[in-house]
């Protein structure tokens, strides 16, 4: 976590804009070529356009040149608690790596980035573009949900629904109310984009600002429906959940019917464009800082499956013989000297690797789980499960071979810590790859989620959320010192405590939230509203 001064990172400035009055009418009244964007609309969009990359750059915190925000909010949080990666920084045995979740205020960062970067940019678009450019505002709403569902899934309740309304302190909302607002916002955005696309197919008014889909509203529409499906599944263990009379099942079925991501060309990926360089911050974490290596959990599972994607996800270590070069570390090892741990496998994520928000494989696995639950997902469970695996292999350019039909010999294996490192432990799961309709329901669910977890790499925040929701994949307990003072089990935290800054500046409201929504304890062992299995 040092300042990285040598990396040149072109960011989008939010300097003064000349507010040029637009003379465009509503897009439905254009009397022009429907595939083109009128010049006066493009000029008008200058008022709000640069706020879109500001939002996009911090859905997953990517905007700071030294990657400190990403490291503390993502890599030392979801990437770690999901089992994908293990930090090897020399922070001692009382850090967040050992479940001291308030260590060095790491727990403040995800909240800070969302409420000082993303939400103010959204507010600018809301105030200056909602009426004049409803189709652009729809994308801003989708970006807001894409960001804030990650944040509420870290902390739980948030001061969210009254953001920007003024006042010295902002009240917190329950996670249930926040989630309900997500579905309302997504449905409104979906309707708006559908209307726009029906009148102006192929038009891309946000092309010069959008770093994810290049202004392609058809892809934004699929992403919105896919996000709706993801969030509907997140509520699957909440009894009686409804939004405007619609159950989790109905919300999920609507999303699939309206059209979700089905191809890798539709994956939500943040990447360089329009004069803005997106430098993947994970590369800084593993290379410049040498603070992270492969996790023992992903080694155990993928080695047991002889999964060819392992060589796509990680680099060979300096340990082992030919054919056995991928080695990781247990979460919780007390690293006092990096010299042995630095030789372990690093993520194969480089400066120009796009930052993944969502992939087609995840959506197929969501649909497989939905069908497993009896929902109409446009296919059968086995078909969708296999499609998820296939799409993941295609995404990473790995050969599928006989992977889908591998027998019982292919299952997670013992983790053996290389010489000079610690944490050897037996495998904690025996789940296999091949779909078996005769298996128990719980075994079927474990199989779906384990493969989904593999496919979502390296997006650890979503993997951690799904681990908390389902209990899968089965992960190793924390190795070594548990520094949580009894506030977190060795199986991992369920949330992060609220930021210290909230106790300093929003004192009354954060204390009220702890009392009302968390049972009086702002601890890491308090389950979120949807963590109800």
PLM region descriptions:
Residues 397-533:
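C-terminal functional modules
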Residues 23-83, 124, 473, 485-533:
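Membrane-proximal, proline-rich intrinsically disordered regions
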Residues 42, 86-143, 147-402, 437-446, ...:
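Structured, solvent-exposed acidic/aromatic patches
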């Amino acid at each position: 976590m040092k300042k990285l001064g040598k990396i040149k990172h072109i960011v989008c400035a939010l300097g003064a804009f000349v507010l040029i009055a637009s003379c465009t009418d509503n897009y439905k009244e254009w009397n022009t070529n429907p595939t083109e964007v009128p010049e006066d609309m493009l000029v008008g969009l200058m008022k709000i356009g640069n706020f879109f990359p500001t939002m996009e750059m911090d859905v997953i915190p990517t905007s700071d040149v030294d990657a400190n925000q990403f490291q503390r909010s993502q890599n030392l949080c979801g990437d770690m608690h999901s089992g994908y990666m293990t930090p090897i920084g020399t922070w001692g045995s009382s850090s967040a790596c050992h479940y001291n979740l308030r260590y060095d205020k790491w727990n403040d960062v995800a909240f800070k980035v969302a409420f000082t970067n993303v939400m103010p940019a959204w507010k600018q678009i809301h105030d200056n573009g909602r009426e004049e450019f409803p189709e652009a505002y729809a994308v801003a709403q989708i970006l807001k949900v894409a960001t804030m569902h990650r944040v509420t899934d870290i902390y739980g309740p948030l001061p969210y629904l009254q953001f920007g309304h003024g006042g010295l302190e902002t009240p917190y909302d329950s996670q249930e109310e926040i989630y309900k607002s997500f579905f309302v916002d997504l449905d409104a955005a979906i309707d708006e984009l559908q209307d726009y696309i029906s009148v102006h197919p192929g038009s891309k008014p946000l092309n010069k600002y959008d770093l994810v889909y290049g202004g392609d509203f058809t892809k934004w529409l699929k992403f919105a429906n896919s996000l709706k499906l993801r969030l509907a599944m997140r509520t699957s263990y909440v009894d009686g959940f409804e939004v405007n009379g619609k159950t989790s099942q109905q919300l999920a079925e609507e999303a699939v019917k309206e059209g979700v991501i089905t191809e890798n060309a539709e994956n939500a990926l943040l990447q360089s464009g329009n004069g803005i360089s997106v430098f993947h911050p994970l590369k800084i974490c593993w290379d410049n800082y040498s603070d992270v290596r492969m996790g023992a959990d992903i080694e155990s599972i993928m080695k047991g499956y002889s999964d060819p994607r392992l060589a796509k996800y990680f680099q060979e270590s300096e340990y082992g013989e030919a054919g056995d070069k991928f080695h990781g570390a247990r979460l919780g090892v007390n690293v006092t000297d990096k010299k042995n741990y630095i030789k372990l496998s690093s993520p194969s994520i480089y400066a120009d690797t796009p930052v993944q928000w969502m992939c087609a494989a995840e959506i197929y696995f969501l649909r497989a789980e939905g069908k497993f639950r009896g929902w109409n997902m446009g296919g059968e469970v086995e078909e969708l499960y296999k499609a998820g695996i296939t799409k993941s292999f295609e995404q990473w350019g790995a050969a599928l071979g006989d992977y889908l039909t591998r027998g019982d010999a292919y299952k997670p294996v013992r983790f053996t810590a290389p010489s000079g490192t610690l944490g050897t432990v037996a495998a904690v799961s025996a789940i296999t790859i091949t779909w078996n309709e005769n298996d128990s329901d719980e075994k079927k669910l474990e199989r779906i989620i384990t493969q989904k977890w593999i496919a979502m790499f390296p997006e650890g925040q979503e993997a951690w959320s799904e681990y908390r929701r389902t209990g899968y994949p089965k992960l190793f307990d924390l190795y070594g010192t548990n520094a949580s003072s009894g506030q977190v089990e060795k199986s991992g935290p369920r949330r992060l405590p609220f930021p210290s800054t909230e106790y300093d500046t929003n004192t009354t409201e954060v204390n009220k939230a702890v009392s009302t929504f968390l049972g009086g304890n702002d601890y890491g062992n308090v389950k979120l509203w949807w963590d109800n299995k």
